[in-house]
Regions:
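Structured, solvent-exposed acidic/aromatic patches
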Residues: 17-18, 56-111, 115-288
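Membrane-proximal, proline-rich intrinsically disordered regions
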Residues: 1-55, 82
């Protein structure tokens, strides 16, 4: 009853990965926010600000800001409150549709681990292994358990993707949902191994033996880690305009940081002239 005779059925969508693929697309922004407000609040005002790439020049509300270590109270939860639904709304549906099997599910695991590490970088311990999607409250994983669980999930995903890539399996039905590498799943293996290496570096002081093991596994892997600029991950998702361009030029709310201009200028790095425009005042030059 009340069924479109010309539309696809749920069975049709499962067969060509349309249902799981569309959910994968919804998870990718958790790694790099393309929507303008989410990008500004998370990637720019937290990641790029504290990473020494940009600084905010606008003031909001009480005049607080991340660069003064005094953001508005309501901003403290932004990374958690925005990213967790982006991960798990799609993840649990993919797990249900795939019964926790197949490449789409393992792809979702890679995205889940990458996004969870971003959240943990901000807050420390977070819910991970105990999340069910049906409970109002969830126990947090300790930092030790969190990283062990993320390593386990990532290792399983790497093994599944690597087996398929090396066997030359047809993964074309997933290509159209890939906003990062356009269906080049060898690059997704490199991404996952590089993520594994980054995680190992994160825990190198707290768990040096585990860090050494995981770092060596990532580098020694048959497909390996990112080693060339062509391996770089770039999300093509946005809401009509590059959000960094929008905030810098349409909204006039950010400028380049003195940190990055000092380092790039000090080392005569050729990327400086690509990243930064010459100052229009005080004799020009690259001024952060």
């Amino acid at each position: 009853y009340n069924t479109n005779p010309y539309g696809p059925t749920q069975e049709d969508m499962i067969g060509d990965n349309a249902s799981t693929g569309s959910l994968i697309r919804s998870m990718i922004p958790a790694l790099a926010q393309g929507q303008q407000n989410n990008s500004q609040m998370l990637d720019q005002m937290i990641g790029s600000e504290f990473g020494g790439q940009i600084t905010c020049i606008a003031t909001w509300g009480n005049g607080g800001n991340y660069y003064t270590y005094n953001p508005r109270i309501g901003w403290y939860g932004n990374m958690f409150d925005t990213t967790m639904p982006q991960i798990y709304t799609g993840f649990f549906q993919i797990r249900k549709l795939s019964e926790g099997k197949g490449l789409a599910y393992q792809w979702a695991q890679i995205l889940r681990v990458a996004a969870s590490m971003r959240i943990s970088d901000c807050y420390g311990a977070i819910p991970y292994s105990q999340i069910t999607g049906s409970a109002f409250t969830t126990a947090y994983d300790s930092m030790e358990d969190l990283y062990k669980n993320m390593f386990n999930d990532l290792d399983a995903a790497i093994a599944a993707f690597e087996t398929a890539v090396l066997a030359g399996d047809d993964m074309s039905s997933l290509k159209e949902y890939d906003l990062v590498f356009d269906g080049d799943f060898r690059k997704w293996v490199k991404f996952a191994n590089t993520l594994k290496l980054r995680m190992a570096i994160r825990i190198s002081n707290a768990a040096p033996e585990l860090a050494k093991q995981k770092a060596e596994e990532a580098v020694a892997d048959v497909i390996g880690v990112m080693t060339d600029a062509s391996d770089a991950a770039y999300s093509s998702y946005n809401d009509g305009m590059n959000p960094y361009y929008r905030v810098a030029y349409a909204w006039n709310e950010i400028r380049v940081s003195a940190n990055i201009t000092s380092y790039l200028g000090g080392y005569n790095d050729p990327r400086l002239s690509v990243y930064v425009d010459n100052a229009s005042l005080d004799g020009g030059g690259y001024v952060g």
